């Protein structure tokens, strides 16, 4: 399984978002409302109402940050970023092992992301656990860091033992649905851009960019 972690916003901006979320008193909902029938049985958290003024404001900020980041754009090839929500997990909250729905009312889920909004020392537990064939990856990032991973993976959120966990989650519908194809293109793009930075433009490099573009046309939706 290939996943990417990256700093999306700085810690100051992340703290400002958390403070806004904490100040919002009337727009929080039981997280079970947005889960499927099976997932609702194993999900406990609070989610900011997607239609609230604050949710729309913050969602636009996060989506714009993702699509304007060259590395994330190359890794995800985003056609649509959707289902973005802000969640709060208190002591005792968790989310058992589950798989994201392949198709949601808002779009197809090729990639899932979690943006950690508060510092890891602010809470105990609350790790994002992504299950692979051989092991379970436990991930708890610094404030402002994002992880993007295939929606095809089973994953869970460990129980929060102390403090509060604040994150933003969402899904990406990619122009290239297949994970292996998308990772291949990511490597090719990174290599070509590295050669461009090191050696400048050349006829040979133009052929590599041409190959990348035409492969994307063939593999894309």
From Swiss-Prot:
Keyword Oxidoreductase: yes
SS bond list: none
Protein keywords: Dioxygenase, Iron, Metal-binding, Oxidoreductase, Vitamin C
Entry cofactors: Fe(2+); L-ascorbate
Gene Ontology biological-process annotations: DNA damage response; intracellular iron ion homeostasis
EC number: 1.14.11.-
A Pfam family reported for this protein in Swiss-Prot or TrEMBL: 2OG-FeII_Oxy_3
Annotated positions binding Fe cation: 98, 100, 155
Top enzyme class: oxidoreductase
PANTHER family to which the protein is assigned, alphabetical: PKHD-TYPE HYDROXYLASE YBIX
NCBIfam families: PRK05467.1-3 (NF003974), PRK05467.1-4 (NF003975)
Protein's name in the database: PKHD-type hydroxylase NATL1_16191
